[in-house]
Regions:
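A charged, aromatic-enriched C-terminal amphipathic alpha-helix characteristic of glycosyltransferases
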Residues: 344-370
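Nucleotide-activated donor-binding/catalytic signature segment of Leloir-type glycosyltransferases, i.e.
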Residues: 244-266
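A short, histidine- and acid-enriched strand-loop-helix "catalytic/donor-clamping" loop
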Residues: 94, 111-127, 142-143
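Short alpha-helical donor nucleotide-sugar binding micro-motif in glycosyltransferases
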Residues: 262-263, 270-275
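Short hydrophobic beta-strand element within catalytic cores of glycosyltransferases
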Residues: 300-303
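Conserved donor-binding/catalytic core segment of Leloir-type glycosyltransferases
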Residues: 196-215, 222-225
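Conserved acidic donor-binding segment of nucleotide-sugar-dependent glycosyltransferases
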Residues: 315-316, 320-327, 336-341
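Aromatic "clamp/platform" in nucleotide-sugar-dependent glycosyltransferases that forms part
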Residues: 283
Length: 376
Protein backbone atom coordinates (compact mmCIF):
# COMPACT_ATOMS: atom_id res chain seq x y z
CA UNK A 1 0.00 0.00 0.00
CA UNK A 2 1.56 3.29 -1.15
CA UNK A 3 0.39 6.46 0.59
CA UNK A 4 1.17 10.09 -0.27
CA UNK A 5 1.19 12.15 2.94
CA UNK A 6 0.66 15.90 3.32
CA UNK A 7 0.36 18.20 6.35
CA UNK A 8 -0.72 21.70 5.19
CA UNK A 9 -0.47 23.32 8.63
CA UNK A 10 3.07 22.22 9.43
CA UNK A 11 5.13 19.65 7.51
CA UNK A 12 6.64 16.82 9.55
CA UNK A 13 10.12 18.15 8.71
CA UNK A 14 9.42 21.62 10.18
CA UNK A 15 12.29 22.73 12.46
CA UNK A 16 10.06 24.10 15.25
CA UNK A 17 8.74 21.45 17.68
CA UNK A 18 4.99 21.39 18.25
CA UNK A 19 2.14 19.02 18.94
CA UNK A 20 1.10 19.33 15.30
CA UNK A 21 4.51 18.24 14.03
CA UNK A 22 4.54 15.38 16.53
CA UNK A 23 1.16 14.09 15.39
CA UNK A 24 2.13 14.32 11.72
CA UNK A 25 5.18 12.20 12.43
CA UNK A 26 3.14 9.77 14.51
CA UNK A 27 0.60 9.31 11.72
CA UNK A 28 3.40 8.48 9.30
CA UNK A 29 4.85 6.05 11.86
CA UNK A 30 1.46 4.40 12.39
CA UNK A 31 0.84 4.00 8.67
CA UNK A 32 4.29 2.46 8.24
CA UNK A 33 3.72 0.29 11.31
CA UNK A 34 0.66 -1.06 9.52
CA UNK A 35 2.69 -1.92 6.45
CA UNK A 36 2.13 1.16 4.27
CA UNK A 37 4.87 2.74 2.18
CA UNK A 38 4.59 6.45 3.02
CA UNK A 39 6.17 9.38 1.21
CA UNK A 40 5.71 13.07 1.99
CA UNK A 41 4.07 14.45 -1.14
CA UNK A 42 4.62 18.16 -0.47
CA UNK A 43 6.10 20.47 2.15
CA UNK A 44 4.03 23.48 1.13
CA UNK A 45 2.78 25.17 4.30
CA UNK A 46 -0.62 26.59 3.35
CA UNK A 47 -1.34 28.24 6.69
CA UNK A 48 -2.68 31.80 6.34
CA UNK A 49 -2.90 33.53 9.70
CA UNK A 50 -4.41 36.82 8.54
CA UNK A 51 -7.95 37.45 7.27
CA UNK A 52 -6.73 38.53 3.83
CA UNK A 53 -8.58 37.08 0.84
CA UNK A 54 -5.82 38.09 -1.56
CA UNK A 55 -3.31 36.06 0.48
CA UNK A 56 -5.71 33.12 0.53
CA UNK A 57 -6.17 33.24 -3.25
CA UNK A 58 -2.42 33.48 -3.75
CA UNK A 59 -1.94 30.39 -1.59
CA UNK A 60 -4.61 28.54 -3.57
CA UNK A 61 -2.64 29.30 -6.76
CA UNK A 62 0.56 28.01 -5.15
CA UNK A 63 -1.32 24.88 -4.15
CA UNK A 64 -2.69 24.39 -7.66
CA UNK A 65 0.82 24.71 -9.09
CA UNK A 66 2.15 22.20 -6.56
CA UNK A 67 -0.69 19.84 -7.45
CA UNK A 68 0.10 20.13 -11.16
CA UNK A 69 3.75 19.31 -10.49
CA UNK A 70 2.81 16.33 -8.34
CA UNK A 71 0.42 15.01 -10.99
CA UNK A 72 3.10 15.28 -13.67
CA UNK A 73 5.63 13.59 -11.39
CA UNK A 74 3.32 10.73 -10.45
CA UNK A 75 1.97 10.16 -13.96
CA UNK A 76 5.54 9.73 -15.19
CA UNK A 77 5.89 6.73 -12.89
CA UNK A 78 4.67 3.24 -13.73
CA UNK A 79 1.31 2.56 -12.11
CA UNK A 80 2.88 0.09 -9.67
CA UNK A 81 4.98 2.96 -8.23
CA UNK A 82 2.27 5.61 -7.96
CA UNK A 83 0.47 6.42 -4.72
CA UNK A 84 -2.62 4.32 -4.07
CA UNK A 85 -4.04 6.78 -1.55
CA UNK A 86 -3.60 10.40 -0.47
CA UNK A 87 -3.57 11.22 3.26
CA UNK A 88 -3.81 14.79 4.58
CA UNK A 89 -3.39 15.67 8.25
CA UNK A 90 -4.98 18.70 9.94
CA UNK A 91 -7.13 20.68 7.59
CA UNK A 92 -9.19 23.72 8.52
CA UNK A 93 -10.02 27.16 7.17
CA UNK A 94 -6.55 28.60 7.90
CA UNK A 95 -4.65 25.60 6.53
CA UNK A 96 -6.39 24.31 3.41
CA UNK A 97 -5.31 21.35 1.32
CA UNK A 98 -5.13 22.90 -2.14
CA UNK A 99 -3.12 19.92 -3.44
CA UNK A 100 -4.54 16.58 -2.34
CA UNK A 101 -8.03 16.61 -3.89
CA UNK A 102 -6.67 17.54 -7.32
CA UNK A 103 -4.00 14.83 -7.21
CA UNK A 104 -6.47 12.22 -5.93
CA UNK A 105 -8.88 13.06 -8.76
CA UNK A 106 -6.15 12.95 -11.41
CA UNK A 107 -4.80 9.59 -10.22
CA UNK A 108 -8.27 8.22 -9.38
CA UNK A 109 -7.22 7.29 -5.85
CA UNK A 110 -9.03 7.68 -2.51
CA UNK A 111 -8.50 10.82 -0.45
CA UNK A 112 -8.24 10.60 3.34
CA UNK A 113 -8.22 13.28 6.02
CA UNK A 114 -7.22 13.19 9.68
CA UNK A 115 -8.21 15.91 12.15
CA UNK A 116 -10.28 17.97 9.75
CA UNK A 117 -12.46 20.67 11.26
CA UNK A 118 -15.25 22.75 9.79
CA UNK A 119 -16.36 26.16 11.08
CA UNK A 120 -19.70 27.14 9.48
CA UNK A 121 -19.44 30.67 10.89
CA UNK A 122 -16.48 31.26 8.53
CA UNK A 123 -18.68 30.81 5.45
CA UNK A 124 -19.03 34.58 5.43
CA UNK A 125 -16.38 37.14 6.25
CA UNK A 126 -12.67 37.53 5.55
CA UNK A 127 -11.92 33.78 5.60
CA UNK A 128 -14.81 32.78 3.33
CA UNK A 129 -12.54 31.84 0.42
CA UNK A 130 -10.33 29.50 2.45
CA UNK A 131 -13.36 28.16 4.28
CA UNK A 132 -14.86 27.12 0.96
CA UNK A 133 -11.61 25.38 0.01
CA UNK A 134 -11.54 23.44 3.28
CA UNK A 135 -15.19 22.49 2.91
CA UNK A 136 -14.60 21.20 -0.62
CA UNK A 137 -11.75 18.99 0.61
CA UNK A 138 -13.93 17.62 3.42
CA UNK A 139 -16.72 16.79 0.97
CA UNK A 140 -14.20 15.07 -1.32
CA UNK A 141 -12.77 12.86 1.43
CA UNK A 142 -13.44 9.14 1.25
CA UNK A 143 -12.89 8.87 5.00
CA UNK A 144 -12.08 11.32 7.78
CA UNK A 145 -10.24 10.16 10.89
CA UNK A 146 -11.55 12.08 13.91
CA UNK A 147 -8.87 12.52 16.55
CA UNK A 148 -11.07 15.03 18.38
CA UNK A 149 -14.69 13.80 18.65
CA UNK A 150 -15.88 17.40 18.97
CA UNK A 151 -15.11 17.86 15.26
CA UNK A 152 -17.80 15.35 14.34
CA UNK A 153 -20.63 17.78 15.04
CA UNK A 154 -19.67 20.12 12.22
CA UNK A 155 -18.40 17.40 9.88
CA UNK A 156 -21.57 15.30 9.87
CA UNK A 157 -23.59 17.72 7.68
CA UNK A 158 -20.87 17.53 5.00
CA UNK A 159 -20.32 13.80 4.66
CA UNK A 160 -21.89 10.42 5.35
CA UNK A 161 -21.49 9.28 8.95
CA UNK A 162 -19.93 6.03 7.75
CA UNK A 163 -17.00 8.07 6.44
CA UNK A 164 -16.18 9.43 9.91
CA UNK A 165 -13.76 7.13 11.71
CA UNK A 166 -12.77 7.64 15.34
CA UNK A 167 -9.00 7.62 15.84
CA UNK A 168 -8.05 8.03 19.52
CA UNK A 169 -4.87 10.07 20.15
CA UNK A 170 -1.82 7.83 20.22
CA UNK A 171 1.92 7.60 20.87
CA UNK A 172 4.77 5.37 19.85
CA UNK A 173 4.62 3.79 23.29
CA UNK A 174 7.41 1.32 22.61
CA UNK A 175 9.84 4.19 22.05
CA UNK A 176 8.53 6.56 24.70
CA UNK A 177 8.12 4.13 27.59
CA UNK A 178 10.69 1.49 26.60
CA UNK A 179 12.96 2.20 29.54
CA UNK A 180 10.97 3.97 32.22
CA UNK A 181 13.36 4.94 35.02
CA UNK A 182 12.88 3.93 38.61
CA UNK A 183 10.60 6.47 40.30
CA UNK A 184 12.67 6.85 43.46
CA UNK A 185 15.95 7.45 41.65
CA UNK A 186 14.35 9.79 39.09
CA UNK A 187 12.74 11.80 41.88
CA UNK A 188 15.96 11.97 43.86
CA UNK A 189 17.92 13.14 40.82
CA UNK A 190 15.44 15.90 39.94
CA UNK A 191 15.11 16.98 43.57
CA UNK A 192 18.86 17.36 43.92
CA UNK A 193 19.29 19.10 40.56
CA UNK A 194 16.53 21.69 41.03
CA UNK A 195 16.22 22.00 44.81
CA UNK A 196 12.77 20.40 44.99
CA UNK A 197 11.54 18.87 48.25
CA UNK A 198 11.09 15.14 47.53
CA UNK A 199 8.74 14.73 50.50
CA UNK A 200 6.07 17.16 49.24
CA UNK A 201 3.61 16.42 46.40
CA UNK A 202 4.92 17.18 42.92
CA UNK A 203 2.44 18.65 40.45
CA UNK A 204 3.58 18.69 36.83
CA UNK A 205 2.66 20.77 33.79
CA UNK A 206 4.33 20.17 30.41
CA UNK A 207 3.59 22.70 27.67
CA UNK A 208 5.13 25.28 25.39
CA UNK A 209 5.15 28.72 27.03
CA UNK A 210 3.21 30.47 24.29
CA UNK A 211 0.75 33.33 24.01
CA UNK A 212 -2.93 32.54 23.61
CA UNK A 213 -4.47 29.34 24.94
CA UNK A 214 -1.27 28.00 26.53
CA UNK A 215 -0.81 31.20 28.54
CA UNK A 216 -4.51 31.12 29.47
CA UNK A 217 -4.02 27.61 30.85
CA UNK A 218 -1.02 28.67 32.92
CA UNK A 219 -2.93 31.64 34.32
CA UNK A 220 -5.89 29.46 35.26
CA UNK A 221 -3.52 26.96 36.87
CA UNK A 222 -1.87 29.72 38.90
CA UNK A 223 -5.26 30.96 40.07
CA UNK A 224 -6.31 27.43 41.04
CA UNK A 225 -3.15 26.83 43.05
CA UNK A 226 -3.74 30.00 45.05
CA UNK A 227 -6.83 28.26 46.47
CA UNK A 228 -5.05 24.99 47.27
CA UNK A 229 -4.64 24.95 51.04
CA UNK A 230 -2.11 22.14 51.39
CA UNK A 231 1.58 21.54 50.60
CA UNK A 232 2.45 21.24 46.91
CA UNK A 233 5.19 22.03 44.43
CA UNK A 234 4.70 22.73 40.74
CA UNK A 235 7.18 21.64 38.08
CA UNK A 236 6.82 23.31 34.68
CA UNK A 237 8.55 21.77 31.67
CA UNK A 238 8.61 23.91 28.54
CA UNK A 239 9.77 27.23 27.20
CA UNK A 240 8.71 29.91 24.76
CA UNK A 241 8.01 33.56 24.14
CA UNK A 242 5.50 33.79 27.00
CA UNK A 243 7.98 32.71 29.69
CA UNK A 244 7.94 36.15 31.34
CA UNK A 245 4.12 36.20 31.44
CA UNK A 246 3.99 32.69 32.89
CA UNK A 247 6.55 33.67 35.52
CA UNK A 248 4.46 36.72 36.46
CA UNK A 249 1.31 34.61 36.67
CA UNK A 250 3.01 32.19 39.05
CA UNK A 251 4.61 34.86 41.25
CA UNK A 252 1.65 35.32 43.67
CA UNK A 253 1.73 31.64 44.65
CA UNK A 254 5.21 31.78 46.13
CA UNK A 255 8.40 29.81 45.78
CA UNK A 256 7.00 26.36 45.15
CA UNK A 257 7.16 26.74 41.37
CA UNK A 258 10.10 25.29 39.43
CA UNK A 259 10.55 26.21 35.76
CA UNK A 260 12.71 23.44 34.36
CA UNK A 261 12.75 24.83 30.83
CA UNK A 262 12.44 22.81 27.65
CA UNK A 263 13.82 19.28 27.99
CA UNK A 264 14.89 16.78 25.33
CA UNK A 265 12.16 14.27 24.63
CA UNK A 266 14.20 11.40 26.01
CA UNK A 267 14.31 13.11 29.43
CA UNK A 268 10.55 13.53 29.75
CA UNK A 269 9.69 10.02 31.00
CA UNK A 270 11.87 10.57 34.08
CA UNK A 271 9.95 13.75 34.93
CA UNK A 272 6.58 12.05 34.45
CA UNK A 273 7.60 9.06 36.55
CA UNK A 274 9.01 11.23 39.34
CA UNK A 275 5.88 13.40 39.66
CA UNK A 276 2.68 12.71 41.59
CA UNK A 277 0.00 14.41 39.49
CA UNK A 278 -0.21 15.98 36.04
CA UNK A 279 -2.21 19.23 36.16
CA UNK A 280 -3.31 21.05 33.03
CA UNK A 281 -6.41 23.22 32.41
CA UNK A 282 -6.11 22.49 28.65
CA UNK A 283 -7.93 25.67 27.60
CA UNK A 284 -9.31 25.19 24.07
CA UNK A 285 -7.09 22.16 23.45
CA UNK A 286 -8.12 19.32 21.19
CA UNK A 287 -6.55 16.75 23.51
CA UNK A 288 -2.87 17.44 24.33
CA UNK A 289 0.05 15.12 23.61
CA UNK A 290 1.74 15.83 26.95
CA UNK A 291 -1.38 14.59 28.73
CA UNK A 292 -1.21 11.35 26.77
CA UNK A 293 2.52 11.02 27.52
CA UNK A 294 1.81 11.44 31.23
CA UNK A 295 -0.86 8.75 31.20
CA UNK A 296 1.41 6.39 29.24
CA UNK A 297 4.04 6.80 31.97
CA UNK A 298 1.48 5.99 34.66
CA UNK A 299 0.98 9.56 35.89
CA UNK A 300 -2.59 10.41 36.94
CA UNK A 301 -3.94 13.74 35.72
CA UNK A 302 -6.38 16.50 36.48
CA UNK A 303 -7.26 18.24 33.23
CA UNK A 304 -9.85 20.65 31.93
CA UNK A 305 -12.60 18.84 30.03
CA UNK A 306 -12.06 20.71 26.78
CA UNK A 307 -12.26 19.21 23.29
CA UNK A 308 -11.14 15.61 23.14
CA UNK A 309 -9.40 15.48 26.53
CA UNK A 310 -12.04 12.95 27.60
CA UNK A 311 -10.74 10.54 24.94
CA UNK A 312 -7.53 10.32 26.96
CA UNK A 313 -8.73 10.54 30.57
CA UNK A 314 -11.33 8.13 31.87
CA UNK A 315 -12.84 10.33 34.58
CA UNK A 316 -12.34 8.84 38.02
CA UNK A 317 -10.38 5.89 36.61
CA UNK A 318 -7.17 7.25 35.04
CA UNK A 319 -7.52 10.82 36.27
CA UNK A 320 -10.12 13.53 36.70
CA UNK A 321 -11.87 15.83 34.23
CA UNK A 322 -12.44 19.32 35.57
CA UNK A 323 -15.05 21.88 34.53
CA UNK A 324 -13.60 23.90 31.63
CA UNK A 325 -12.29 27.33 32.58
CA UNK A 326 -13.22 27.05 36.28
CA UNK A 327 -10.22 27.73 38.54
CA UNK A 328 -12.13 27.01 41.74
CA UNK A 329 -13.27 23.62 40.47
CA UNK A 330 -9.76 22.86 39.21
CA UNK A 331 -8.32 23.59 42.65
CA UNK A 332 -10.91 21.35 44.31
CA UNK A 333 -10.18 18.55 41.86
CA UNK A 334 -6.44 18.73 42.56
CA UNK A 335 -7.16 18.65 46.29
CA UNK A 336 -9.39 15.59 45.83
CA UNK A 337 -6.84 13.84 43.63
CA UNK A 338 -4.00 14.27 46.12
CA UNK A 339 -6.03 12.28 48.66
CA UNK A 340 -6.78 9.47 46.19
CA UNK A 341 -4.85 6.26 45.57
CA UNK A 342 -2.61 7.74 42.89
CA UNK A 343 -0.63 4.53 42.46
CA UNK A 344 -3.74 2.57 41.45
CA UNK A 345 -4.98 5.40 39.24
CA UNK A 346 -1.57 5.60 37.58
CA UNK A 347 -1.55 1.87 36.83
CA UNK A 348 -4.99 2.18 35.25
CA UNK A 349 -3.78 5.11 33.15
CA UNK A 350 -0.85 3.11 31.84
CA UNK A 351 -3.07 0.12 31.02
CA UNK A 352 -5.52 2.28 29.10
CA UNK A 353 -2.74 3.98 27.16
CA UNK A 354 -1.20 0.64 26.23
CA UNK A 355 -4.52 -0.78 25.03
CA UNK A 356 -6.04 2.17 23.20
CA UNK A 357 -3.34 4.78 22.52
CA UNK A 358 -0.38 2.97 20.97
CA UNK A 359 0.85 2.46 17.41
CA UNK A 360 -0.78 -0.97 17.18
CA UNK A 361 -4.27 0.41 17.81
CA UNK A 362 -3.76 3.43 15.55
CA UNK A 363 -2.28 1.39 12.70
CA UNK A 364 -5.15 -1.09 12.85
CA UNK A 365 -7.73 1.70 12.57
CA UNK A 366 -5.94 3.57 9.77
CA UNK A 367 -5.00 0.59 7.62
CA UNK A 368 -8.42 -1.07 7.94
CA UNK A 369 -10.21 2.06 6.69
CA UNK A 370 -7.79 2.55 3.79
CA UNK A 371 -8.00 -1.09 2.76
CA UNK A 372 -11.80 -1.01 2.78
CA UNK A 373 -11.74 1.83 0.28
CA UNK A 374 -9.02 0.30 -1.90
CA UNK A 375 -10.97 -2.96 -2.06
CA UNK A 376 -13.98 -1.28 -3.67
Amino acid sequence: MRVAFYAPLKPPSHPVPSGDRTIARLLIAALRHGGAEVTVASRLRSWIGVPDEAAQRAMAKRGAAAAARAITRYCALPKRARPQAWFTYHLYYKAVDWIGPAVADALDIPYFLAEASHAPKRAEGPYAFSHAGAEAAIRRADAIFCVNPVDRVCLEPLTAKRRLVDLPPFLDLARFTRRLPDRASARQTLARRHGIDPDQPWLLAVAMLRQGDKLASFRLLAEALQHLDRPWQLLIVGDGEARAEVTRAMKPIGGGVFLLGALPREQLPAVYVASDLFVWPAVNEAFGMALLEAQACGLPAVAGAWGGVSTIIADGETGWLSAPGDATAFSADIDFALDADLVAIGKAARRKAAKHHGLDAAAATLIAAIRRKLAK
